[in-house]
Swiss-Prot record:
Localization per record: Cytoplasm
Catalytic activity as recorded in UniProt: UDP-N-acetyl-alpha-D-muramoyl-L-alanine + D-glutamate + ATP = UDP-N-acetyl-alpha-D-muramoyl-L-alanyl-D-glutamate + ADP + phosphate + H(+)
Keywords assigned: ATP-binding, Cell cycle, Cell division, Cell shape, Cell wall biogenesis/degradation, Cytoplasm, Ligase, Nucleotide-binding, Peptidoglycan synthesis
Protein's job: Cell wall formation. Catalyzes the addition of glutamate to the nucleotide precursor UDP-N-acetylmuramoyl-L-alanine (UMA).
EC number(s) reported in the record: 6.3.2.9
Record-given protein name: UDP-N-acetylmuramoylalanine--D-glutamate ligase
GO cellular component: cytoplasm
Homology family: Belongs to the MurCDEF family.
Species of provenance: Staphylococcus aureus (strain MRSA252)
TM region(s), chain numbering: none
Length: 449
């Protein structure tokens, strides 16, 4: 829907190109605005910048001249650019309106919105909601921080579709009228304080997600963080999720996901592992129920959805052994979540780039580790760690060799977990490449029939 006229003949300055700035500039031009794009990087050889210039859009790059503010433009800010950047700081002082392209997505689309934010879990929740829609006859288009520019997707959705948008705290700061029908706050912990300066500012940024909601809308949030999340501004109907007790919303009871007293699915039938993922699942299920997704489609998704690639991703089963790819676990905190996600014996594949870290903080999470296959620059450190805890330790050359060596020690019902707790750059260009090598080697060991 491009009949929105609120920006026609208005001066608009897009600060920061990247994907979102590029799409926002094109959209603003279609809406009749006088658009200028500004980026601190030199864009003289940038293909997107040249494309915009061919459309008659002015591109100023290499610095942030404050003279760009002299025509009192509306600012559309790339979410990654902090408010301390000179041109944004000056725009604030002058009282200029500052938006993000997520606000534009709301202005041009009549589709109802499911918006997801939170410190952890938002990508998993957004992806799971998208998968549940896909299993039904309804359409839910993913957008936002998950990699699909919201203002581009908003031009493609029908009023009968849902726009399912992952929002970072950076994007939420640019909200003026944005109003999701269903808002989800997965959790709020301390994060991005370099951008927000303090925890209170960060929390307030997250709360922007519901500031325009009315009594006809829904907020879904963690029951055990309700005091952090809720405020006097909240007008939406609030529903909760909890893995610990019955709440007004959705919860776990006697091993089942329960909504309004009705059992939906046994948690043992879920493919996605981990207590933290149980919370993500509850939030996604509740949102989809409210959006009218059939229970059958929700169950189909929960029994097949294997997670985000390289984030505790279920790869497959060989005989009785499940394999999980958690290559994105490049620090000990992420690996703590992974090790804590299984009750079965674990063969843990770990190691990678040596940044001078010690790994003793993982000891409390190693109870279910039966054996370790270690590789990379930190191989010796992990071998020492395993030996100190009486674990069986095998050394490998790399991830592929580690999967091969697993075959010599694996026992029925063992879980094979790649969760390196280290960056990949000692042996692989990216954590994605490392994860793909793990998956390829797993498949090579599958029996051929």
């Amino acid at each position: 829907m491009l009949n929105y006229t609120g920006l026609e003949n208005k001066n608009v300055l897009v600060v920061g190109l990247a994907k979102s700035g590029y799409e926002a500039a094109k959209l603003l031009s279609k809406l009749g605005a006088n658009v200028t794009v500004n980026d601190g990087k030199d864009l003289s050889q940038d293909a997107h910048a040249k494309d915009l210039e061919s459309m008659g859009i002015s591109v100023v790059s290499g610095s942030h001249p404050l003279t760009l503010l002299d025509k009192n433009p509306i600012i559309v800010k790339n979410p990654g650019i902090p408010y301390t950047v000179s041109i944004i700081d000056e725009a604030v002082k002058r009282g200029l309106k500052i938006l993000t392209e997520v606000e534009l997505s709301y202005l041009i689309s009549e589709a109802p919105i499911i918006a997801v934010t939170g410190t952890n879990g938002k990508t998993t929740v957004t992806s799971l909601i998208g998968d549940m829609f896909k299993k039904s006859r309804l359409t839910g288009r993913l957008s936002g921080n998950i990699g699909y520019v919201a203002s581009k997707v908003a031009q493609e959705v029908k009023p009968t579709d849902y726009l399912v948008t992952e929002l970072s705290s950076f994007q939420l700061l640019g909200i003026e009228k944005y109003k999701p029908h269903i808002a989800i706050i997965t959790n709020i912990y301390s994060a991005h304080l370099d951008y927000h300066e303090n925890l209170e500012n960060y929390q307030n940024a997250k709360k922007q997600i519901y500031k325009n909601q009315t009594e006809e809308d829904y907020l879904i949030c963690n029951y055990h963080q309700r005091q952090v999340i809720e405020s006097e501004e909240l007008k939406a109907k609030t529903l909760y999720f909890s893995t610990q007790q019955e709440v007004d919303g959705i919860y776990i009871k006697d091993g089942f996901i329960v909504y309004k007293g009705v059992r939906i699915i046994n948690t043992e039938d879920l493919v996605l592992p981990g207590e933290h993922n149980l919370e993500n699942i509850l939030a996604a299920v509740l949102a989809c129920i409210l959006a009218g997704v059939p229970i059958k489609a929700i169950i189909d998704s929960l029994t097949t959805f294997s997670g985000i690639e390289h984030r505790l991703q279920y790869v497959g089963t060989n005989r009785t052994n499940k394999y999980y790819n958690d290559s994105k676990a490049t620090n000990t905190l992420a690996t703590q979540f992974a090790l804590n996600s299984f009750n079965q014996p674990i063969i843990w594949l770990c190691g990678g780039l040596d940044r001078g870290n010690e790994f003793d903080e993982l000891i409390p999470y190693m109870e279910n580790v039966r054996a370790m296959v270690v590789f990379g620059q930190t191989k010796a450190k992990f071998a020492k760690l395993g030996n100190s805890q009486g674990k069986s330790v095998i050394e490998a050359n790399n991830v592929e060799d580690a999967v091969d060596k697993v075959q010599d020690i694996i026992e029925p019902n063992d879980v094979v977990l790649l969760s390196p707790a280290c960056a990949s750059w000692d042996q692989y260009s990216t954590f994605e490449e490392r994860g793909e090598k793990f998956i390829e080697r797993f498949r090579a060991h599958l029996p051929s029939y």
